[in-house]
């Protein structure tokens, strides 16, 4: 699959494909609205998103309580069918596929903030794409840095995301591979196909007291390590001003260690 050049129109599909759009920022987030509207120019789009923000929930699935799946006309999607779910991003994809029919593509985002390196392990945005992949559907996750003023302009990112999604609909993706796409904080210099790099967080816990003297805790994190100087990685590419497109394979086996580990295992 070829990543489209920003100056070259994408190939036209023979019929309007069906695209399921999800996110982790919630149904009212500006990124999913911009993405859904951009995709609707060439696809039949349906939006299924959490009713409240679900950032950093990872690939959680709700199994201990029922889920509510409600149509909403208040999220600003115009004629695009939009549904809110009181669950996780992965729940949204599961319900969207099973209740509304299998789409041709699952798209997640555009996330408020990047998802780079180890972020992929706890990102609800990426988890929605992973859930699409586990259901046998080509899937893409989109995330974006804020600009230097701390603001988000999703219009240009949504336009490129739409073109990339259309290319994937035309060409497909290899089995068990999704695309994780990150937009830089500046006007992009171009597009880079990248490796998932290093973006390590040091977890910290802030403890405070409520008015009754009881402790409560905030779990936070500080970015402590990254490979921002290596433009072949996702973090390095966006730091250099490029759109990062990382092919991510859903294969957790360290195959290069199977032989060595087999020899090292103690006998039963």
Swiss-Prot record:
The keyword Signal does not apply. It comes from Deinococcus radiodurans (strain ATCC 13939 / DSM 20539 / JCM 16871 / CCUG 27074 / LMG 4051 / NBRC 15346 / NCIMB 9279 / VKM B-1422 / R1). It holds the Pfam family SurE. PANTHER family: 5'-NUCLEOTIDASE SURE (PTHR30457), 5'_3'-NUCLEOTIDASE SURE (PTHR30457:SF12). Nucleotidase that shows phosphatase activity on nucleoside 5'-monophosphates. It catalyses: a ribonucleoside 5'-phosphate + H2O = a ribonucleoside + phosphate. Binds 1 divalent metal cation per subunit. Its EC number is 3.1.3.5. It is an enzyme of class 3 (hydrolase). GO terms for cellular component: cytoplasm. Keywords: Cytoplasm, Hydrolase, Metal-binding, Nucleotide-binding. Gene3D superfamilies: Survival protein SurE-like phosphatase/nucleotidase. The keyword Magnesium does not apply. This is 5'-nucleotidase SurE. Its main location: cytoplasm. Belongs to the SurE nucleotidase family. Its cofactor is a divalent metal cation. A divalent metal cation binds at residues 24-25, 55, 111. The gene is surE. It is found in: Cytoplasm. GO terms for molecular function: 3'-nucleotidase activity; 5'-nucleotidase activity; exopolyphosphatase activity; metal ion binding; nucleotide binding.
């Amino acid at each position: 699959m070829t990543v489209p050049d920003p100056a070259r129109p994408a190939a036209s599909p023979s019929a309007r494909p069906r695209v399921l759009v999800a996110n982790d920022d919630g149904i009212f987030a500006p990124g999913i609205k911009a993405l859904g509207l951009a995709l609707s120019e060439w696809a039949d789009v349906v939006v299924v998103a959490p009713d409240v923000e679900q950032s950093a929930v990872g690939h959680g699935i709700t199994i201990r309580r029922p889920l509510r799946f409600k149509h909403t006309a208040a999220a600003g999607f115009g004629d695009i069918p939009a549904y809110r779910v009181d669950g996780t991003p992965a729940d949204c994809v599961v319900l969207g596929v099973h209740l509304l029919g299998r789409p041709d593509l699952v798209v997640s985002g555009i996330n408020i903030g990047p998802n780079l390196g180890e972020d992929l392990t706890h990102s609800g945005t990426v988890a929605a794409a992973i859930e699409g992949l586990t259901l046998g559907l080509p899937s893409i996750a989109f995330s974006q840095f804020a600009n230097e003023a701390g603001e988000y302009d999703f219009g240009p990112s949504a336009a490129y995301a739409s073109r990339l999604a259309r290319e994937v609909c035309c060409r497909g993706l290899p089995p068990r591979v999704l695309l994780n796409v990150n937009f830089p904080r500046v006007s992009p210099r171009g597009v880079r196909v990248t490796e998932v790099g290093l973006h390590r967080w040091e977890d910290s816990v802030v403890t405070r007291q409520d008015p009754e003297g009881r402790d409560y805790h905030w779990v936070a994190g500080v970015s402590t390590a990254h490979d921002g100087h290596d433009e072949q990685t996702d973090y390095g590419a966006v730091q250099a001003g490029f759109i990062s497109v990382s092919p991510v394979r859903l294969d957790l086996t360290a195959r290069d260690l199977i032989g060595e580990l087999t020899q090292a295992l103690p006998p039963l």
